[in-house]
Amino acid sequence: MPSSIKPKKLGHLVLKVRDIHESVRFYTEVLGLEVSDWIEEQMVFLRCGSDHHDLGLFQLPDNSPDLNNISSEGSPGLEHFSYEVEDYREVERAISILQEKNIEIVRGPGKHGPGENVFLVFRDPDGNFVEIYCEMVQVTEDQPYEPSVWEDNLDAFDQWHFKKFVVDPPALYEEKLKKSELS
């Protein structure tokens, strides 16, 4: 008997949203997702590939609190979710699209140390962090991977040291950036 469940991949994510129609416009017009199905005006299922859905949106009641006005820093919960794109050119194209649509870019583009993936993070209409990424290290039977422990420094967060960022680096990393410039 196996000692643990062995998932194949992350299947889908469901977000609670304040305006389901605004969110559908965002995810279809900005990220290019396609609508698979609706449950009346209460829930919608969207996809980017062959699975019926990888994102569900659930309409909150009108009297729900605006959690964007409540600090969630240091609280458990979703930090971000991500979609893979073909290559770095698509990340660059995404920057232009986001800027043209006045969508807040939060961080990137950068290149994480762990996973070596290129990333770009922006906000959806409800303030959730959405990441697109490419070029992540693949771990297969033919390409085994030995886990390592990364030092909590600039290289772990962004191997490019914010040189390609189109926004200011996160405050958390400004001190690490100063230290790396002194070395």
Please state what every model-predicted region is.
Residues 34-76, 114-116, 123-125, 129-137:
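Conserved short beta-strand elements that form part of the metal-binding/catalytic scaffold
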Residues 1-3:
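A detector for short, charged/polar N-terminal pre-domain segments
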Residues 5-9:
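A short, Lys/Arg-rich alpha-helix, primarily the initiator
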Residues 17-21, 82-129, 134-140, 146, ...:
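Vicinal oxygen chelate
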Residues 10-12, 76-80:
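Eukaryotic phosphotyrosine signaling hubs
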Residues 21-34:
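Amphipathic alpha-helical segments
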Residues 12-15, 34-35:
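Mature N-terminal segment immediately following signal peptide/propeptide cleavage
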Residues 32-38, 105-109:
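Short secondary-structure junctions
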